[in-house]
Amino acid sequence: MPVLAVIPARLGATRLPRKPLRLLGGEPIVVRVYQRVVQLGVADHCVVATDHPEVQEACARHGIPVVMTRADHPSGTDRVAEVAAQPEFSSFDVLLNVQGDEPFVSREALAGAVEIVTSGLAPIGTAAVPVSVDTLQRPDVVKVVCADDRRALYFSRAAIPFLRDASDAAVLAPLVRQHVGVYAYARQALQQWVSWPPHPLELIERLEQLRPLAHGLSIGVTTVAATEGGIDTEDDLVRANTHWDVLHAANSSAYRSA
C-alpha cells in the first residue's frame, strides 16, 4: 500500500510561538522533521501542510514540497485530510501524519503505526512509549491505555488508570503508555474521522484522537522504545538543541575515527 506522509505545520502555536520556524541545529524545526521522515524511508512520498506563507517559503528554500491548506482546521488530522483529498495524492492508500514538532521520531514508531493499518488490525494506527509513574500526573504527557489486542481504550492528560492503592504502582508499567504524535490512517478512516464534528471529549481534553474513539472507530497502538520527545515549549527547544548537538558531535567523532 503506497504511503503518503504529511507534516502539519501551524505557525500559531501558543506555548512555543512560531514553532515550525524556530531553529534546531541551525535549521527550522519543520525542515528537520521533514528530513527525518525522508531519512527513515517509511513513506513513499512526504509533504508539509501549512496555512502560512512563511512556512511555505522556509520549506521552498530547502526544496521541500508544500501544500497550502485552510487556516481554520480544528486539528492536524483535518489538515492532513485536506491534503489527502487533492487529486495528485489519490493513489496513496495510507496517510501518515507526523506532527511537525517530532524531529527525533523513530522508524519503529512510523513503521509500527503503518503496519497496524496495512495488517488490518485497526483502520488507524499510532505509537506509544513506556511512561514512568512520576509523569502520570503531568497534563502535558498524554497517556493511553489499551485492550489486550493493542486497541486503544482511552487517551487522557489525566493519570489513567487511577491508582487507588499506592502499593499497586508496579502493575501500572504494562498498562499505561505515553502517546507519540504519529498517526497512520486508512484513507476511508481518515475521511470518516473528519466527517464528524469535534467531540465534547476531544474539546475537553484537547486531544483530537478522542473523536474517532467516541464514534467507535478503532485505533491500534504500537509500543516502541522511548526516544527524545517532541518540542512544545521553550525548555523543550533548549533540550532538543542540546540533544541535537550531542548526536551530531558523536556522529562527527565516529566519522573522523573511521
From Swiss-Prot:
A Pfam family matched in the record: CTP_transf_3
Example of a GO biological process term: lipopolysaccharide biosynthetic process
Catalysed reactions listed for this entry: 3-deoxy-alpha-D-manno-oct-2-ulosonate + CTP = CMP-3-deoxy-beta-D-manno-octulosonate + diphosphate
UniProt keyword list: Cytoplasm, Lipopolysaccharide biosynthesis, Nucleotidyltransferase, Transferase
GO cellular component: cytosol
Membrane-spanning parts: none
InterPro entries according to UniProt: Cytidylyl_trans, KdsB, Nucleotide-diphossugar_trans
Biological pathway: Nucleotide-sugar biosynthesis; CMP-3-deoxy-D-manno-octulosonate biosynthesis; CMP-3-deoxy-D-manno-octulosonate from 3-deoxy-D-manno-octulosonate and CTP: step 1/1; Bacterial outer membrane biogenesis; lipopolysaccharide biosynthesis
Location(s), subcellular: Cytoplasm
Keyword Acetylation in record: no
First-tier enzyme category under EC: transferase
Keyword Cytoplasm: yes
Family designation: Belongs to the KdsB family.
Protein name listed in UniProt: 3-deoxy-manno-octulosonate cytidylyltransferase
Natural source organism: Gemmatimonas aurantiaca (strain DSM 14586 / JCM 11422 / NBRC 100505 / T-27)
Lineage: Bacteria, Pseudomonadati, Gemmatimonadota, Gemmatimonadia, Gemmatimonadales
